Amino acid sequence: MKFSEAWLRTWVDPDISRETLVERLTLAGLEVESTEPVAAPFKGVKAARIVAVEPHPSAPRLQVCQVDIGSGSLLTVVCGAPNARAGLWAPLAIIGAQLPAGIRIELAKLQGVESFGMLCSAAELGLAEQSAGLLELPEGDFPGVDLHEFLQFDDISIEVDLTPNRSDCLSVAGIAREVGVLTQSPVTEPAIEPVTAQIGDIFPVTVTAPAACPRYLGRVLRGVNPQTQTPWWLRERLRRSGIRSLGLVVDVTNYVMLELGQPMHAFDLERLKGGIQVRYGQADEALTLLDGTHLRLDEETLIIADQQRALALAGIMGGEESGINNQTRHLFLESAFFNPSVIAGRARFYGLHTDSSHRFERGVDPELPRRAMERATALLLEIAGGQAGPVIEVADSSQLPPQATIILRKARIHRVLGVEIAESRITEQLTRLGLKVERIEEGWEVKVPSFRFDLALEVDLIEELGRLYGYDRLPSTRPVGQIQPVLKTEAGAFIDRIRQVLVDRDYQEAITYSFVDQELQQLLDPEGSPLVLNNPISTDMAVMRTTLWTGLVQALQYNSYRQQERIRFFEYGLTFNGQLADLKQERTIAGLISGASYPEQWGLVGRPADFFDLKGDVEAILSLVGEQRNCFEFMAASHPALHPGQSAQILREGQAVGWLGALHPWLESKLDLSSRAYLFSLQLEAVERGSLPVFQSLSKFPAIRRDIAFLVNANIPVQVVFDCLKGCESDILKEFQLFDVYTGKGIDPDKKSLALKLILQHPSYTLTDDRVNIFIERVMALLVTELGAIIRE
């Protein structure tokens, strides 16, 4: 919400400085995001009156103006603006003036005529991006007044960053109400009286969706002068609030929206057919908006229509075919209350965000439409003339938001805030906020006004009191109570162990959104069944994640673009598959590595991370299940998002529980990644089912190492060799490990040489050579029989 300090002070004018006002707003929860001067710095510019205008003797596009700045004599100024005319008040930069663009005004001779200054446009003063002629000023009492004083440029624009629940402050009226409470200052509202109907013209209104639009007001205005310029004061208040002037009618509706908080819309009455209908759209119904956007509507979009076509997106933006222009003389004014739940998300669904939708989706006071209608009508008739018809109102009170009644207990206030607030002050502050307060035995019975959608519970009122008392003034009191140890479930403790394992391996935990980009997720998990959100935060957060990889890959992109060369992320969270009726939520642990295998150091030659680095990290997680680690195996398999030659499926007792591998090269190219990325994903439930450790005393007898080298077919995975060894049941085989793989010279092309290290040890006695040799011969025979191995000497 952006507004000018001067406008606010016409409503409430506390005796505090500008800096204090900004600070008080921020401390009260209305965070001031920025303040800026309402005009660019310039000096030497006066409010001047053009007395006479004559054609330039030798330049047909120029005029010679005689200008009065109250100095006793007229100044000759050469000007090329088309709107320069006698009687016009305009800004004059005198000799020596400094303009915002760094321009210094000097005595100049234009086509033989000396010019003693420059008449200025709004653009030349930094008040607009572009302008076609001189800035036309309101008539003053005396020419020659400094323009800063003449136009009250000693002002600032204040922009407040409001939280979504404070829609009541999306207006000058709402901000003024807050300032009045904070400073105990009176609030002076403009007098808004009902406008008496001068004509009997009405335009029928039908509301077929009362739950979506419980209140709709319309009014016919005839004979409005379309050539009337928006008054300077109104244009300036809009500009200082960040809104461009777009013509009188639009300016007035925007002004009322900023002043009172009620978005309005004006239709060209002569372009409407039959009557207004407030209804839901029809499938594939067409609508062209005021900004030229062509839409195909759906059946969940609330629209304003006539008997022939859709006219506007309700609460969002009007349509081109019914919009007003500089020839419009007859208007139909709309002022309505739309249910926030109906408007929320529709603007984003169509890729739109307007001041109107911003307010309606947060909640507009349902009692405000009539007041806004009268205010807009009065302004239009006062400025542009015309005649107003009666107000037509269609309302369903049963569909309006109920006004909550809350019991506020004094003891509860003290217990939550830790400070005693005088009863009289509580009553005064709540009343100033617009709440109806009645004293009862235990505290107060408070009736919430229609404009406060955020007040529903007792704690909401206590929060208001704390906010107005001042969060900075609340005492800091340590809680007193018994400290109880936090009891974690086995599942909670297990994920903490996984976290610790990964952190020890130099990973960082990431927490990403559960809402993800549908296109990216389709690339990473094309077989998933994502749940599409009806009301997405944005178009790139439109579906629920079916895999954690989507968020991790986006995090990789973000960090890569910021020159992070070594990235190791993991995330624990839920994935969502299916639709609402059969939605499957699954706890998942996933990780991603990219860049160097280990941090740069002097003692090791750097190398990029590879598939086996990631596999080692996954094996470290699987080792947490104890003896049941042997239930897991890695099988080469194909995944659409992974490199076809560097991907594996993780199985537990034959059932798929996860994936790991390198990101597909095509995806790396599409995502513009600078280095190869490796990912894993694992169902947490699969690794939670482990066995408790069983104590085994260490053998005091020596361990013996034996190495076996053999040839097998090149297409046999090492995992098959390991499975073969696991089948060799023995009480002396403590450990086996692959320590060499060789292909090339001296080996048949269809073979590979593997070398295994076997560690043998018995818990009760020293192994003899005979016992060891018998076991080794048994292992070699098993390899030959099961795998067709050729033992190497």
Curated annotation (Swiss-Prot):
It comes from Nitrosococcus oceani (strain ATCC 19707 / BCRC 17464 / JCM 30415 / NCIMB 11848 / C-107). It catalyses: tRNA(Phe) + L-phenylalanine + ATP = L-phenylalanyl-tRNA(Phe) + AMP + diphosphate + H(+). This is Phenylalanine--tRNA ligase beta subunit. InterPro entries: aa-tRNA-synth_II/BPL/LPL, B3/B4_tRNA-bd, DNA-bd_dom_put_sf, Fdx_antiC-bd, Fdx_antiC-bd_sf, NA-bd_OB-fold, Phe-tRNA-ligase_IIc_bsu, Phe-tRNA-ligase_IIc_bsu_bact. Residues 39-148 form the tRNA-binding domain. It is found in: Cytoplasm. It holds the Pfam family B5. GO terms for molecular function: ATP binding; magnesium ion binding; phenylalanine-tRNA ligase activity; tRNA binding.
